[in-house]
Amino acid sequence: MMKKITVFLFLAVSLFFTSCKSSVSVKPSAVGADFDVSISFGSAFCGLFSAVFPSEEGGETRSFFDDAQITQMLTATGIQNVRVKSNGQTSLQISGSAAASGNPLVDSGIIVFAPDGNVSLVFSFQNLQALYGLLPFELASYIDMLMAPAFTGEEMTDGEYIDSVATVYGKNVADELNDGEVKFNIHGTDARTNSSSLSAVKLLNVIGTVRFCGKRAGEND
């Protein structure tokens, strides 16, 4: 029986090879920060992984994901309260909690806690490189599949990056990546939500620092 896709391959690839239906929500909690990642997969992504993980004998359709395995592997990284729900080959939802230290999301500087209790997501070349360095070898190896400048350190334009993806994975996958967008919902301590979107390519080829905050710009502590 062929292995189902592991959480490592999912984390490295699936969030970005999608249609425009990915979202990330983060809010302060007693643990530190609760997060929820919701992903709907595009047809090119599904086709790519159907080729890598073909149907078993008898032609029965099976899920790309093993919910229990994903839960176990995320828990092993220091993420708490992990919950995973997949829907065959079309969608995946993962939620969990990140404490103030002891997990790659916080230790890399991607999740940042403010003195007032609000939470931010911060993406830069430096902290994505830090995240890469904190991950186990297997996960880092799958991240290499993205060929993302933010992880490889190679300087290239967004167009050059898309072209390189098309060369390796095909035009349809590259087009989905180019059209992909991630919506970020950052919930503040005052129960208000700041929502912003960023293209997948701008995230994988990040320049400078991109910050999504739980407090609106200009608000005082």
What do these predicted regions represent?
Residues 2-3, 178:
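Position-driven detector of the extreme protein N-terminus
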Residues 3-10:
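Sec-dependent signal peptide recognition
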Residues 16-19:
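C-terminal motif of bacterial Sec signal peptides marking the signal peptidase cleavage site
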Residues 22-26, 31-39, 96, 119-121:
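One face of beta-strands
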Residues 30-35, 40-49, 101-103, 191-192:
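Primarily extracytoplasmic ectodomains and periplasmic/lumenal surface modules that are beta-strand-rich
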Residues 41-72, 135-138:
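Post-signal-peptide N-terminal segment of Sec-exported extracytoplasmic proteins
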Residues 75-221:
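Mature, soluble, non-transmembrane domains
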